[in-house]
C-alpha cells in the first residue's frame, strides 16, 4: 500500500510491502551444500519513495513468544493476516530459491549431487518393491531433492529423455516430478516412470500448441523448463 506524504516542496510516498522473508546460511564442502542456519518470518518493509528512489525506512518483524500472533494480526491487513500466520504456505518455494542462489554462488555440480542422492535412496530397503518405501526410508534425501527444485527437474528431464528409465530410478523420478510440478500431474496409470514421462512430455507439447511460452512459464513452469530443453 502507498501513503502520500509531503516534506517541504518535495513530493514523497511511503510504500509498505507485506511479505514472508526467509534467510538461510550454507556451508560448502566436498561438493555439497550444508544448511547451517536461517530464519523464516512475516515482515513489513516500509520504503520512502522520492524522485524514483526507494529508501528503506523501517523493517518490521513480529516479537517472539506470546506476542507473535497478536503482533501479526495488528500489523497485517485482515485479508492477508492468515497467510502471514501460515509460514508453511510458501516455504518450499522460498527454500528452493535459497538453494538456487547458493548453487550459483558456490558453482555446485548439481547433477553429481542429485545423482548421489538418488543412489542413496535406491540402496535400501533392498527387499522393498514399492517406491514409496524407499522415499520413507530416505526422507532427508528426498527433501533435499525437493529443495534443489529446478535442478532436480533438469536432472529428471535429461534422464527420461535418454530413455529406458523402467526401473526403480524411473519410478522415483516420476514421483519427484509430480511433487515438484503438481500443476502438471497426469491422472493415468503407468507401468514405469518412462511410460509416464513419455505421456507427460506429449502433454507439454500439446500445451505449447495452445499457449505461448510466456503463458506456460507462468502457469506450467515445469513444462516451460522441459520445452526450453527440447526446442
Model-found features: residue ranges?
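Mature extracytoplasmic domains of secretory-pathway proteins
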Residues: 2-65, 137-167
Amino acid at each position: 500500500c502507498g501513503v502520500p506524504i509531503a516534506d517541504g516542496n518535495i513530493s514523497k510516498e511511503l510504500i509498505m510491502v507485506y511479505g514472508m522473508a526467509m534467510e538461510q546460511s550454507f556451508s560448502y564442502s566436498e561438493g555439497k551444500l550444508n544448511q547451517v542456519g536461517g530464519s523464516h518470518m512475516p515482515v513489513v518493509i516500509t520504503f520512502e519513495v522520492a524522485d524514483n528512489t526507494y529508501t528503506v525506512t523501517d523493517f518490521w518483524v513480529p516479537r517472539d513468544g506470546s506476542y507473535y500472533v497478536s503482533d501479526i494480526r495488528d500489523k497485517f491487513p485482515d485479508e492477508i493476516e492468515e497467510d502471514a500466520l501460515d509460514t508453511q504456505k510458501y516455504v518450499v518455494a522460498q527454500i528452493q530459491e535459497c538453494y538456487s542462489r547458493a548453487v550459483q554462488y558456490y558453482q555446485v555440480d548439481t547433477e553429481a549431487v542429485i545423482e548421489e542422492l538418488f543412489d542413496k535412496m535406491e540402496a535400501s530397503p533392498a527387499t522393498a518393491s514399492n517406491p514409496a518405501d524407499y522415499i520413507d526410508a530416505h526422507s532427508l534425501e528426498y527433501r533435499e531433492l525437493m529443495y534443489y527444485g529446478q535442478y532436480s527437474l533438469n536432472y529428471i528431464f535429461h534422464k527420461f529423455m535418454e530413455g529406458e528409465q523402467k526401473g526403480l530410478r524411473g519410478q522415483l523420478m516420476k514421483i519427484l516430478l509430480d511433487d515438484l510440478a503438481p500443476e502438471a500431474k497426469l491422472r493415468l496409470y503407468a507401468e514405469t516412470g518412462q511410460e509416464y514421462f513419455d505421456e507427460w512430455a506429449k502433454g507439454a507439447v500439446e500445451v505449447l500448441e495452445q499457449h505461448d511460452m510466456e503463458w506456460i512459464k507462468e502457469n506450467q513452469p515445469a513444462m516451460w523448463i522441459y520445452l526450453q530443453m527440447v526446442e
